[in-house]
Amino acid sequence: MKVVLIGSVEFSLRALEKLIAIDVDLVGVCTKKSSTFNSDFFDLKPLCDINEVPCLYVDNINSTKNVEWIKNLNPDVIFCFGWSSLIKKDILAVAPMGVVGYHPAKLPKNRGRHPLIWALALGLKESASTFFFMDEGADTGDILSQVDFEISYQDDARNLYDKVVEIALIQIEEFIPALEKGTYTRIKQNEKESNDWRKRNELDGEIDFRMSSRSIYNLTR
C-alpha cells in the first residue's frame, strides 16, 4: 500500500516517524519550509532526506503543480495530519482510498479550530482522538478510527497534546493493516450531533476576575 503524507506540525513528524518505523511504503511527503500559522510547526524534510523519502515543499497544497506531483506517485491512500488549509477535491480524488485526516475531538462534536485548547478552556472532562476520511467539508467525513480519552484536572496544553499523540500513534499502527487488507469500516457522522468551534483570538485568553476560580484555571492551562 503506497502512502503519501501531508503535514507540517509536531504530530506530522511523530506520525512520519511511526510510518517509517513500521515500514509503510511511503512514496512521498508534502510539507512546509516555514510557517507563521502553527506554533507547533515542524519541517518534515530533514527526516525524509535521512530515510530517502521524496519530499516536496509546498505553500498551496491544492495548486495544479502539487496535485500532479502527488498523482505521479500513484498513492493508494493519502494521510493529511497537521495541515492548516482545506484539501480540495482534486487531491481528495487522487488515491483510491481517499485522504485520511485527523482531528483530536469526539467527532461529529467539536469540529473546527483548536480542539484541544477549547477542550481545556471549556473544562471538558473527556474527548477523543479521531481519524476520518476527508471530504470537502471541515472534519465532516466518515470516521475510520476513534478512541476516547479523559482530560484530568492536572492536564495542561502540553501534556494533553502528548497524551493525544501517543493514542493517535497506536491508532495508526492498528488501522494501517485494515487499510492494507481492505477490512476497515467507515462510520458516517451524525450531523444532528455536530457543532463547530471557531478560531480562538486574543480576547478568548483574557482573564476576567469576576469569573470563577475554575474558569480562570481552565484559561491558564
Residue positions per predicted region:
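One-carbon transfer enzymes
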Residues: 1-221
